[in-house]
A protein has these predicted regions:
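Short, intrinsically disordered, charge-biased short linear motifs at domain edges
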Residues: 2-10
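Short, positively charged, Gly/Tyr-enriched micro-motifs
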Residues: 8, 14-139, 145-152
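Short small-residue beta-strand/loop micro-motif enriched in glycine and branched aliphatics
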Residues: 29-33, 56, 173-179, 335-337
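RNase H-like nuclease fold core
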Residues: 83, 95-207, 211, 215, ...
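Short coil/turn segments at secondary-structure boundaries
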Residues: 88-91, 131-138, 289, 302-306, ...
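Short amphipathic alpha-helical surface patches that mediate protein-protein
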Residues: 91-95, 120, 291, 295, ...
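Extended amphipathic alpha-helical interaction segments
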Residues: 199-206, 211-361, 376-385
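A short, flexible helix-boundary coil/loop motif
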Residues: 359-397
Length: 397
């Protein structure tokens, strides 16, 4: 076997080889299963050795960009970068800027479809080794959803276009983002489908007092202890009292009670006198809430124990989940209008989940992408833009 020239444009040439069989059979040219682009340097900083011109980074067959460039882009969008920004960086690093057809000068392009296609094809590949296989069997499972609003072009009003369901669990006592998925509503059917995607059952679930969510937890995890998030309960009570305050009749007593809500939720010592004062105010809607949902608060005080002795994986609220989902909210919010395909969005969320769990490593991504390509004769196992919405009806609207 010997070198037999190159193919491709200058700066991106790929090596051809000539096979000359010792048996006397006709010689033939070929390229590697994963062809290497020409190296731009004489040494590799990663493996700390000299490299030849033919020992550059690996690329998929019929792909202009190398596996490492794809991996870096996947990590970037998982960390919150937009498709456009990640695509611009990928083109600049790979020196793949398009030329202006008139002047011949390099033309900067921030079109995001390049990286969007990579997310569609390779996000499941890099996510698969880290995909949770079952729900955690210890600690608590924390559930919440992130609503994203977009402007309706017909009415001009903003509405919730979709929600991202998020779950956090504990692995070896450490918090871990367990699952993310986009849904168009937060109905019981959607929550049951989301929770039913994995086998097993956690011992304890913490969530909001939303009817669809609570009913789905009881249906899917009948043996789990259900604990309603104290932050959401307190926030619901504050909203109710805020509405009552606007009516003016009970403004003074509501102002007095509002200042004591946060302290009341610390435990039964302050909760009991707070409830007595609220009932004494003679406000029917407030008394009704305290006689129903307030009983849940009292019952949970007996289960949560003292803060000093409470294990870290037994929180009374979903607030530990906020550290994972707040960056996702910030990254998705400004571009929510453009996320209309549910499956593509879920593949983007795979990368965000890997980033949240600190599992997004360029070298690992490159290794997984190369293994996938090698197993499929140098090409991806799915075609680009195969994930589409039938009939031009957006699946995430």
């Amino acid at each position: 076997m010997r070198f037999a020239g190159h193919h491709g444009p200058p700066g991106h040439r790929r090596q051809r080889y000539m096979c000359v069989p010792a048996s006397g059979e006709p010689a033939h040219r070929f390229t590697e299963l994963l062809p290497c682009e020409e190296s731009w340097t004489d040494a590799c900083e990663t493996c700390e050795r000299e490299v030849g011109l033919h020992e550059g980074p690996h690329a998929a067959r019929s792909y202009q960009f190398v596996a490492r460039g794809i991996a870096e882009s996947l990590r970037a969008v998982g960390a919150g970068s937009t498709y456009r920004d990640a695509a611009l960086v990928a083109r600049e690093r790979a020196k793949r800027l398009r030329c202006d057809p008139v002047t011949g000068e390099p033309r900067f392009s921030r079109h995001g479809s390049l990286v969007m296609d990579w997310v569609e094809v390779f996000a499941p590949v890099v996510f698969e080794p880290y995909r949770p296989r079952e729900w955690p069997t210890s600690g608590s499972l924390l559930l919440d959803d992130l609503p994203f609003r977009v402007r309706d072009p017909d009415t001009g009003r903003h509405r919730v276009a979709f929600r991202i369901f998020a779950v956090m669990g504990y692995a070896a006592g450490r918090p871990k983002l367990w699952r993310l998925e986009a849904h168009t509503s937060k109905s019981q059917v959607d929550w049951e489908a989301f929770l039913g995607a994995l086998p097993g059952s956690p011992p304890r679930v913490v969530c909001d007092n939303d009817g669809g969510l609570v009913n789905s937890v009881r249906s899917r995890f009948p043996g789990a202890g259900l604990y309603l998030c104290e932050w959401h309960l307190r926030h619901a009570l504050e909203r109710l009292m805020g509405k009552i305050r606007t009516e003016g009749e009970h403004r003074d007593v509501i102002d007095e009670l509002l200042g004591d809500i946060e302290a009341a939720f610390t435990g039964p010592t302050l909760w009991t006198p707070f409830v007595e004062r609220a009932h004494a105010a003679g406000i029917p809607r407030l008394s009704e809430w305290l006689s129903t949902t307030g009983r849940v608060v009292e019952e949970q005080f007996g289960r949560r124990g003292q803060r000093s002795t409470r294990p870290v994986e037994m929180p009374p609220a979903t607030s530990p989940l906020d550290g994972f989902i707040n960056p996702i909210r910030a990254a998705v919010g400004p571009r929510a209008y453009g996320l209309k395909n549910r499956e593509r969005t879920n593949r983007l969320l795979m990368l965000m989940q890997l980033h949240a769990n600190r599992q997004d490593d360029d070298s690992d991504y490159v290794r997984l992408i190369r293994a996938c390509l090698e197993a499929n004769h140098g090409r991806p196992n799915v075609a680009r833009r195969a994930v589409i919405d039938v009939g031009r009806i957006a699946s995430l609207r």
